[in-house]
């Protein structure tokens, strides 16, 4: 499947302003850092056969749109998320080599490394939907039922976003806008928890797993287990539980999920 590349109109406006204000070179370095970060996600998504539907170029970064991200194997998704963060370790090596060859000045080297460090530290914040928040989400999904993991991820992130803004960042309009966006995403995700769970259940009905068995009484599924649910009438396997919930399901239409960098 070919990957669509989408550039927002606001991105074009920002690029034009940067060009005419002689800020194109710094903006180019920032874009390269973000593109390298995203390439780490893209490589591991391709490696684990997650279809990449779209690459969006936004004013504040890039975003991959992956089909069924959040429904598949949580350990694979941890690798996909860590792959993007690991690319920040390449920047010091690459720019350090360029500096030794005279390709960039010492001042530019220090500036690029500072930007690279800031982007990395921002992304590892345990706030959904940043990489750090999604890593926390995947870890919850390794050990907890789906609905519980989602509630903990989004609830703690919604509480932590204002605290991170107050404690870690300067109160300028751009920072306020970024953290306001993160908080809004958390509120929307909280309201969509039931839909997300139903989508996950339907995905599991169409794509049965081969994980180790988990016997429990919850009317929910552990994402990293094949679930056997103990009910008053006896044991109910995961497939039977899902079939009772949905009936016979046809092909599942793709509902892509994305993360923003």
Label each PLM-derived region with a short phrase:
Residues 1-26, 85-88:
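Topogenic membrane-insertion module of multi-pass membrane proteins
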Residues 143, 148-261:
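C-terminal transmembrane module of polytopic alpha-helical membrane proteins
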Residues 1, 74-125, 134, 183:
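Metalloprotease/metallohydrolase-associated module, dominated by Zn2+-dependent proteases
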Residues 20-26, 96-114, 166-174:
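Helix-coil boundary and interhelical linker segments in multi-pass alpha-helical membrane proteins
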Residues 59-94, 147-170:
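Multi-pass membrane catalytic core of lipid/isoprenoid biosynthesis enzymes
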Residues 98-107, 137-152:
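Membrane interface segments of multi-pass transport proteins and intramembrane proteases
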Residues 19-77, 111-115, 119:
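Small-residue-rich helix-interface/hinge motifs
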Residues 51-55, 124-142, 195-199:
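Juxtamembrane/interfacial segments flanking transmembrane helices
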């Amino acid at each position: 499947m070919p990957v669509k590349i989408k550039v927002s109109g606001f991105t074009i406006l920002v690029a034009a302003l940067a060009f005419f204000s002689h800020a194109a070179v710094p903006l180019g370095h920032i874009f390269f850092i973000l593109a390298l970060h995203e390439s780490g996600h893209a490589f591991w998504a391709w490696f684990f056969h997650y279809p990449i539907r779209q690459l969006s170029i936004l004013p504040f970064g890039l975003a991959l749109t992956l089909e069924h991200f959040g429904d598949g194997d949580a350990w694979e998704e941890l690798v996909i998320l860590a792959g993007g963060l690991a690319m920040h370790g390449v920047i010091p090596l690459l720019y350090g080599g360029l500096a030794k060859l005279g390709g960039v000045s010492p001042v530019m080297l220090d500036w690029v490394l500072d930007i690279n460090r800031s982007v990395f530290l921002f992304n590892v914040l345990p706030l959904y939907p940043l990489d750090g928040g999604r890593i926390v989400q995947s870890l919850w999904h390794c050990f907890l039922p789906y609905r519980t993991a989602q509630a903990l991820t989004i609830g703690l992130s919604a509480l932590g976003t204002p605290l991170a803004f107050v404690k870690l960042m300067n109160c300028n309009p751009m920072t306020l806008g970024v953290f306001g966006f993160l908080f809004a995403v958390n509120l929307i995700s909280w309201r969509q928890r039931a839909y997300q769970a139903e989508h996950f259940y339907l995905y599991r009905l169409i794509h049965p797993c081969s994980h180790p068995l988990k016997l429990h009484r919850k009317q929910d599924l552990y994402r990293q287990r094949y679930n056997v649910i103990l009910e008053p009438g006896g044991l109910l396997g995961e497939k039977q539980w899902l079939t009772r919930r949905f009936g016979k399901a046809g092909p599942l239409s793709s509902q892509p999920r994305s993360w923003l960098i």
